[in-house]
Amino acid sequence: MKIEDFIIKLDQIPIINKDSMLKEALDEMEKFKLGIVLIIDTDNTLKGVITDGDIRRLILKEQKPMSAFLSEDISKHANFFPKTINVNDNLLNTLNFMNKNRIWDLPVIDEGKRLVGLVHLHLALEKIIENLVKKN
């Protein structure tokens, strides 16, 4: 199975630009009900990610007023070397990679590192189960 059948499209995932604030990242996570925000530049090149876990750890570590924390620039805290998968990869490799790295959400990029979408582990498993049920 190709990974492209399991990708959440760009208009259905949290995306912000690298000049956004942490509050915008949280707003996007809440809007799309996902625990990751993808950071892109103007040509959709993936620049980084920040997860709800990253933000939770920052809050505990920083110990500053929430208003000051939320107004900080995302670039101060984002992971600018995220794990990704290529759009041409297959589902088995992708799921093995996610399992091995304990990743729930994996950005999908093309050869130019442009963001294509996101694989969310639970949604991928849901589709796999649906396919198995149909076959039986």
Which residues fall in each region the model found?
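Acidic (E/D-rich), amphipathic helical modules within compact regulatory domains
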Residues: 23-61
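The conserved cystathionine-beta-synthase
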Residues: 15-34, 40, 84-102, 108-110, ...
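Append "Primarily bacterial transcriptional regulators
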Residues: 44, 112-113
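Tandem CBS (Bateman) regulatory domains
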Residues: 1-12, 47-86, 90-100, 115-136
